[in-house]
C-alpha cells in the first residue's frame, strides 16, 4: 500500500461527499415537480411526452397501481429487447454481420438489462450489432435506472406523507428521472469520454495490419454514449468484453476516476433527497454514514489484500503485490477501489478481472453483493434496500427496549417487518439455493474453470451477482450455456422484483399512517447509536447468512494458499 493509493481513495471520497448536497437538492426539486435550471428547455418536452402517452401527470397511484405500472413497463421492455436480439441479423446497423442471438442467451440478456443487472454471457463486440447496443441495451440502461429511482422516491414519499393512499405516479417519476437527471448528465459525460479518446461512431470495424503483417480487426462503435449511462445508471454492461479494462472503454486515468465517480454520485445524493423530503437532512446523512463505514472497511481490506498478495504469491517471493488481471495504467489502488465501488453499487463494470484477485481481495466484492447491495447500491435500489434494513433495525431496537418501534413518526408494525424480511430473504434464497443446485448437477459443475474452493467461488459469485442485480463475474465461469443462462435469469428476476414490490407495499402502508409526535422515549435516528445499530443489522442479517458459503470458498482458499496448496485447473 502506498501514500499515492490512499490519496486516490481519499480524493474520491471527498469529491463524492462534495456532490451529495448539490445533486440531492436538484433531484428533490425534480421529483417534487418544482422548477429547475433545465425546466425552460425540458418542461415542454415533458408535457409533450405525457400528452402523446395519454398520461395525466396530476393523477397519482396507490402502491399497488404503482407496482403494476412498473411491472407492466418492464415486461414490455423485456419483450421488445428479446425480439430485437433475436432479429438483429435482419435489421440495419450491423456492419460486422452479426448473427441472431441464441434463444437462451437472448432470454438471459434481455432479463439482465431490464433488471439493471447487465450480466453478460457474451462478448459485446463479437455478438451484438450497433442497433442492439444502442436501441436495446443503452435504452434499457436508462429506463431500468429510472425505474429504480422511481421506487426509491415512492418509498421516501411513504415516510414523508401521512394519511394518504397515493405515492405519486410511476410514469411521471420515471419520466422526470430520465429527462431531468440521467439524460443531461450522460450528455456531458459522453462528450467528456470522447475527448479522452473513447470511440463514438457508426463506422464499421477497422481492419489493420500489425507489424508482423497479420490482419487484425479493431472493434469500434457508439461506445461513449453507452458507457456514460452504464456507469451513471449503475448498469455495468460493457460495450466490449473486457468492459472498463478495455482501452476504448476506459482510455485514461481521468476517465477511470470519472467513471468511478459516476457510479456512486446518484446513489449517494439520493440519501440527501431522502433527508430533504422527510424534512430532516440529518436522517439522510446518518444513512450515508452507515453506507460509508461499510464502504471504507471494504476498500481497506481489498487494497491491503491486493497490495500484499498474501498466500501463494508471497510464498513465491513476489513483493510487488498482485498485478494479475489488472491494467498497469491503473495499478493496484485504482483497481481495488473500482472493484469495491462497482460491487457496493450494484454496477458490475470492472477495470480489472475479479477472478484474478487474491482470495481475500475477491471476498469483499462478493460480500458487498451479499449484503444486499446497500452500500450506496444501485441508483434508487441502494437507498430503498438500506431503508428496508432500517425498518428491521428499528424493529429490533423497539424489541430491546419494549416500545412500539417508530421511524420518522410512523409506527413500524408487523406488515412492514414482514414485507422487509421478504425483500431481504429472497436474495439468499436465490444466491445460495442456485449455488447449491449448480454444485450437484453436471451442467453446473461443467461451468467453473478452476477446481477446489475457487471453482466453488466462481459459481457462488455468479448467482450472487445475478440475484443482487450486479452483473460482475469471476470470469473463469463458462456461463453461456442453457443451464446458466436460464438459472441466472431467474435469479435476476427474483432479485429485482421480489424486492421492489415489497418495498412499494411498505411505502403504501406507511403513507396511510398518521404521523406521531416525537416524545422523550423516541429513539433518535440521526446519531451514532443508530448508525452503529444499522451497520450491525446489515452485517448480522446480511453477513452471517453467507458465512458458511464464504468459508467453503474464499476463506478456505486463503488459508490453503497461505499453506502453499494449489488446486488443479478444471471443474
UniProtKB/Swiss-Prot annotation:
In terms of Pfam families, this protein maps to: KdpA
Has UniProt tagged this entry with the keyword Transferase? Answer: no
Q: Which GO terms describe its cellular component?
A: plasma membrane
Please provide, alphabetically and separated by semicolons, the GO molecular function terms listed in this UniProt record: P-type potassium transmembrane transporter activity; potassium ion binding
Membrane-protein topology: Multi-pass membrane protein
Q: In which compartments does the protein localize?
A: Cell inner membrane
* Keywords associated with the record: Cell inner membrane, Cell membrane, Ion transport, Membrane, Potassium, Potassium transport, Transmembrane, Transmembrane helix, Transport
In which family does this protein belong, per the annotation? Answer: Belongs to the KdpA family.
* Quaternary structure, from the entry: The system is composed of three essential subunits: KdpA, KdpB and KdpC.
| Full protein name | Potassium-transporting ATPase potassium-binding subunit
Give the encoding gene's name. Answer: kdpA
Amino acid at each position: 500500500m502506498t501514500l499515492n493509493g490512499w490519496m486516490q481513495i481519499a480524493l474520491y471520497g471527498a469529491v463524492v461527499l462534495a456532490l451529495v448536497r448539490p445533486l440531492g437538492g436538484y433531484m428533490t426539486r425534480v421529483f417534487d415537480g418544482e422548477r429547475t435550471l433545465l425546466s425552460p428547455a425540458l418542461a415542454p418536452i415533458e408535457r409533450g411526452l405525457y400528452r402523446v402517452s395519454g398520461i395525466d401527470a396530476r393523477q397519482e397511484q396507490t402502491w399497488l397501481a404503482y407496482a403494476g405500472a412498473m411491472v407492466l413497463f418492464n415486461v414490455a421492455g423485456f419483450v421488445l429487447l428479446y425480439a430485437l436480439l433475436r432479429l438483429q441479423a435482419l435489421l440495419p446497423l450491423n456492419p460486422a454481420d452479426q448473427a441472431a442471438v441464441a434463444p437462451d442467451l437472448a432470454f438471459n440478456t434481455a432479463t439482465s438489462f431490464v433488471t439493471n443487472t447487465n450480466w453478460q454471457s457474451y462478448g459485446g463486440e463479437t455478438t451484438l450489432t450497433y442497433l442492439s447496443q444502442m436501441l436495446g441495451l443503452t435504452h434499457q440502461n436508462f429506463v431500468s435506472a429510472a425505474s429504480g429511482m422511481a421506487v426509491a422516491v415512492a418509498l421516501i414519499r411513504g415516510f414523508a406523507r401521512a394519511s394518504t393512499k397515493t405515492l405519486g405516479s410511476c410514469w411521471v417519476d420515471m419520466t422526470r428521472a430520465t429527462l431531468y437527471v440521467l439524460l443531461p448528465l450522460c450528455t456531458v459525460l459522453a462528450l467528456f469520454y470522447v475527448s479522452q479518446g473513447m470511440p463514438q461512431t457508426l463506422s464499421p470495424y477497422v481492419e489493420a495490419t500489425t507489424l508482423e503483417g497479420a490482419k487484425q480487426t479493431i472493434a469500434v462503435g457508439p461506445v461513449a454514449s453507452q458507457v456514460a449511462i452504464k456507469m451513471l445508471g449503475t448498469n455495468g454492461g460493457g460495450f466490449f468484453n473486457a468492459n472498463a479494462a478495455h482501452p476504448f472503454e476506459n482510455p485514461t486515468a481521468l476517465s477511470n476516476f470519472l467513471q468511478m465517480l459516476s457510479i456512486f454520485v446518484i446513489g449517494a445524493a439520493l440519501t440527501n433527497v431522502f433527508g430533504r423530503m422527510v424534512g430532516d437532512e440529518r436522517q439522510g446523512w446518518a444513512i450515508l454514514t452507515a453506507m460509508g463505514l461499510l464502504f471504507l472497511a471494504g476498500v481497506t481490506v481489498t487494497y491491503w489484500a491486493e497490495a500484499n498478495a498474501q498466500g501463494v504469491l508471497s510464498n513465491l517471493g513476489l513483493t510487488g503485490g498482485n498485478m494479475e488481471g489488472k491494467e498497469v495504467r491503473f495499478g493496484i489502488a485504482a483497481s481495488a477501489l473500482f472493484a469495491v465501488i462497482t460491487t457496493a453499487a450494484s454496477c458490475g463494470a470492472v477495470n480489472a478481472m475479479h477472478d484474478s484477485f487474491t482470495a481475500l481481495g475477491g471476498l469483499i466484492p462478493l460480500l458487498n453483493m451479499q449484503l444486499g447491495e446497500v452500500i450506496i447500491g444501485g441508483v434508487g435500489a441502494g437507498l430503498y434496500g438500506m431503508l428496508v434494513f432500517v425498518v428491521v433495525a428499528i424493529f429490533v431496537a423497539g424489541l430491546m427496549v419494549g416500545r412500539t418501534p417508530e421511524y420518522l413518526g410512523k409506527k413500524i408494525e408487523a406488515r412492514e417487518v414482514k414485507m422487509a424480511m421478504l425483500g431481504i430473504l429472497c436474495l439468499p434464497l436465490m444466491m445460495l439455493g442456485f449455488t447449491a443446485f449448480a454444485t450437484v448437477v453436471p451442467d453446473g459443475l461443467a461451468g467453473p474453470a478452476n477446481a477446489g474452493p475457487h471453482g466453488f467461488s466462481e459459481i457462488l459469485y455468479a448467482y450472487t451477482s445475478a440475484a443482487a442485480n450486479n452483473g460482475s463475474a469471476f470470469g473463469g465461469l463458462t456461463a453461456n450455456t442453457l443451464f446458466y443462462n436460464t438459472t441466472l435469469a431467474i435469479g435476476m428476476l427474483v432479485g429485482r422484483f421480489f424486492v421492489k414490490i415489497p418495498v412499494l407495499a411498505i411505502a403504501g402502508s406507511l403513507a396511510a399512517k398518521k404521523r406521531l409526535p416525537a416524545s422523550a422515549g423516541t429513539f433518535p435516528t440521526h446519531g451514532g447509536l443508530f448508525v452503529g445499530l444499522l451497520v450491525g443489522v446489515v452485517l448480522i442479517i446480511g453477513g452471517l447468512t453467507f458465512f458458511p458459503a464464504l468459508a467453503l470458498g474464499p476463506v478456505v482458499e486463503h488459508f490453503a494458499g497461505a499453506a502453499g496448496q494449489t488446486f488443479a485447473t478444471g471443474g
